[in-house]
Amino acid sequence: MKSGIHPTYVTTTVTCTCGSTFTTRSTAASGQIHADVCSACHPFYTGKQKILDTGGRVARFEARYGKRTPAN
């Protein structure tokens, strides 16, 4: 590698708004990164993910316009 063209790679502490912290390496000069979400509080990783109710939308459409009848 060429010297002088790569940024310094330092040990960095990542702090989430939930209070969770972990250590990694980064080019952030301050050695501190503040994150809004992490794997400890993100709904996808915690299992508290909300699934949209698309079936309710179909039922509402059918109630409004009626269910289609086959044309035989």
From Swiss-Prot:
Zn(2+) binds at residues 16, 18, 38, 41. InterPro entries: Ribosomal_bL28/bL31-like_sf, Ribosomal_bL31, Ribosomal_bL31_A, Ribosomal_bL31_sf. Pfam families: Ribosomal_L31. One of its GO terms (biological process) is translation. It comes from the Bacteria. GO terms for molecular function: metal ion binding; rRNA binding; structural constituent of ribosome. Keywords: Metal-binding, Ribonucleoprotein, Ribosomal protein, RNA-binding, rRNA-binding, Zinc. One of its GO terms (cellular component) is ribonucleoprotein complex. Its cofactor is Zn(2+). Belongs to the bacterial ribosomal protein bL31 family. Type A subfamily. This is Large ribosomal subunit protein bL31.
